Design a protein with these regions (language model features):
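Boundary at the C-terminal end of the N-terminal hydrophobic targeting segment
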Residues: 28-30
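Bacterial N-terminal signal peptides
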Residues: 13-24
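Cys-nucleophile CN-hydrolase/nitrilase-fold catalytic domain and related Cys-dependent amidase chemistry
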Residues: 73, 77-174, 181, 247-263
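Cysteine/selenocysteine-centered motifs that mediate thiol-based redox chemistry or coordinate metal-sulfur cofactors
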Residues: 195-236, 315-376
Length: 376
């Protein structure tokens, strides 16, 4: 609860956000997130069958270059060349999916150094990719480390961008949550989970699991792995194609999630140098149907572009011929779900800029303090 005496001392922007958070906490579900009759919103399909292409490639870390600008230019050129290749080989793509970090790669060091190895979305890089999307008449999807100096100063964001056929950013998908309990470190990036209240106040509940309704089907993009509840929520919201970006992943997870939720799915993984300890986990990108059957796959750790034509008209027809989402036994499981207490509370990165953890080790300390399960 916001105390009246504290209002006068708040900066205008902070006051507005605080009031929005207070309002969102009292107005439960002001918008309809799931229709009661099992239907979901969609736009008419431009065509019955849609072509998805998935790119897997080796990305160089920006810190490996003499300067960040040189690194971005190199990685952007690589993305451009792969996009042109995807547009000129095989069938014309309607969607081109890249991996989690094709522009930035990874970064080490303190937060201030990691922030240098990020991009803004939209920004110069999405503008350049937008020209390619427009020329190819395709959607381009990719993940990236990103920053937002206006709304989220000091935070390292993990975003998935969708660039439309018109060359503009159509949607930005935040990472829902991070995997926990790595050992000596925790991932210090900002997700919906760890700034939940401010996120909802700023963007609304619809953006917790946003759905981009396109002329080729309802899509969403996610970087989370082995997280069935997240994907069930997306399915309830009407997702028909689940695009996934990763650095290392579980093939069975992709197949099972698609089968459980009756949607198409595509996963793009990066590749690693052959002498890397992670080389065995590189590549393996795939596209699966709503039963989890593999439609296209490259099991190697090599650069590749795979493609599959998917029947969106048949998917819609097959969903009980009434635009129905999958069936979930919510009433049966709710008594258990209602009593489950997550180990880590929401909003654990809703702290002042100077208190944001500087490294994975510092994030580990913060998370251990926040844990509801560990002995204090």
């Amino acid at each position: 609860m916001i105390k009246p005496k504290s209002l006068a001392s708040m900066p205008l922007q902070t006051l507005a956000l605080a009031l929005a958070i207070a309002a969102s906490s009292t107005a439960a579900h002001a918008v309809t997130l799931v229709e009661k009759d099992g239907s979901y919103a969609q736009v008419p399909l431009e065509k019955d069958k849609v072509v998805i292409k998935v790119v897997q490639n080796l990305t160089r870390n920006l810190q490996d270059f003499p300067s960040i600008d040189e690194g971005l230019a190199h990685n952007l050129e690589q993305m451009a060349n792969l996009t042109k290749r995807a547009c000129s080989e095989g069938k014309k793509p309607d969607f081109i999916l890249f991996n989690e970090f094709p522009l930035t790669g990874y970064s080490d060091g303190p937060r201030v150094e990691k922030l240098k190895s990020t991009i803004t979305i939209p920004g110069p890089e999405t503008d350049a990719l937008g020209k390619l999307a427009k020329a190819c008449d395709t959607y381009i999807i990719f993940g990236s480390y990103a920053r937002d100096d206006v709304d989220w100063p000091g935070h390292i964001l993990s975003l998935n961008a969708v660039i439309g056929r018109d060359g503009k950013v159509a949607e930005k998908f935040w990472k829902t949550r991070n995997i926990k309990n790595y050992g000596d470190i925790e991932i210090p990036t900002t997700t919906i989970e760890n700034v939940y209240d401010k996120y909802v106040a700023r963007y609304g509940e619809e953006e917790l699991f946003p759905v981009l309704r396109t002329e080729f089907g309802n899509i969403a993009v996610s970087t989370v792995q082995n997280d069935p509840m997240v994907f069930a929520a997306y399915a309830m919201r009407g997702v028909e194609i689940m695009f996934r970006t990763a650095t290392l992943f579980n093939k069975l997870d992709v197949q099972a999630i698609a089968g459980f939720n009756n949607f198409y799915s595509a996963m793009s993984n990066i590749t690693f140098p052959t002498d890397s300890p992670y080389a065995k986990g590189g590549g393996g990108s795939l596209i699966v149907d709503p039963r989890g059957q593999v439609l296209a796959e490259d099991p190697s750790n090599d650069e590749a572009i795979i493609e599959a034509e998917i029947d969106m008209a048949a998917l819609r027809k097959g969903r009980n011929k009434a635009r129905h989402i999958p069936h979930y036994p919510m009433a049966v499981v709710r008594p258990v779900f209602d009593q489950y207490v997550e180990e880590f509370p929401l909003n654990h990165l809703d702290v002042a800029i100077d208190q944001l953890p500087d490294s994975g080790a510092e994030m580990k300390v913060l998370m251990d303090k926040q844990s509801r399960w560990k002995s204090k």
